[in-house]
Amino acid sequence: MENPYIKQFPDLMSGKKIMYVHGFLSSGQSGTVKMLQDLMPNATFVAEDIPVHPEEGMEMLLKLQETEKPDLIIGTSMGGMYTEMLKGTDRILVNPAFEMGNTMSSMTGKQEFQNPRKDGVNELMVTKGLIKEYRDITERCFQDITPEEQARVYGLFGDKDPLVHTFDLFHEHYPNAIRFHGEHRLIDKVAFHYLCPVIRWIDDKQNGKERPIVYIDFDALHDSYWKATSSMHKAYEMLIEYYNVYIVASAPTNDHEYMAKVQTWVEVYLSTPAYNHILFTNQKNLLYGDYFIDPHPAEDFMGTTIEYGSDEFKTFEEIVTFFDRLGGQ
């Protein structure tokens, strides 16, 4: 149900089904499911309690995938580990715990579930035997990965995650390894700013949708001290909801470090939504798109140029107003 009091994306995954795979000591009644439902009110969510023993858990999830035929599967932590093995469906793994045996090694003894389960069980004993079961199941990850599967899977990794560190392991097998600003849990801020843009890419691909292209010159994003310009984040967040946004920077032949500096800046200030959305070129006029926000527009750009810093567009606030009036056109 749409809620006028919170920011939502009613068009995102509209009419589609999302399967959520929860983490260790959680359940299908996790607050994360409600949070995602609030963000995408016109999507249907499927989330079930995963059995404690991993063999049973994997069997249940495979049956659920076959029965429900979800359009997208999102798994967090332990659920991310399971989700990697649910082949044939578009998938997002958030801080996937591919090394569950090591992660659980400090958790031996009685543990309480963080969310209510349908079976009424509220605690479990973590034993060496259970840890071995999880270590064994993780050895099945990353098997028989085809190019088609690589294109279906995205991994999101918090740059401040204190529990799981599997970015490099994931990236050995899948190209779409993306960092975000956050810790281990999928909180609302992370879902809104980082998860939803990735879901939008997947949704567009499934729908065969091509959004209008907006280029933003890198020099419009930062000041002389390389700090973000006023209202830049506000404008960027608004634009990525409706447009395919690319950052354009120069590629100085005699300064190779500049490109690395730009990539680092974009990762720090824009993060996940800008993944694979940076273009380096010394010939901006050759780019083909719909709009170009640029302090020094190319005269022969085959689209609409917006001169950032001009009397008409002094700041990004004026640019927000301009695009708001366009309504995503």
Q: Where does each model-flagged region fall?
A:
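Active-site catalytic motif of lipid deacylating hydrolases and related acyltransferases
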Residues: 5-67
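Charged phosphate-binding loop/patch that engages nucleotide di/tri-phosphates or the phosphate backbone
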Residues: 3-7, 19, 176-211, 304-329
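Short, acidic loop-to-helix structural element flanking the phosphoryl-transfer center
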Residues: 222-246
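Short, hydrophobic beta-strand segments that form beta-sheet elements in well-ordered domains
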Residues: 71-75, 91-93, 153-159, 278-280, ...
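Gly/Ala-rich beta-loop-alpha elbow adjacent to hydrolase catalytic centers
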Residues: 74-84
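Asp-based phosphoryl-transfer active-site loop
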Residues: 208-226
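C-terminal cap/substrate-recognition subdomain and adjoining C-terminal extension
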Residues: 256-329
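The alpha/beta-hydrolase serine catalytic core
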Residues: 90-92, 96-202
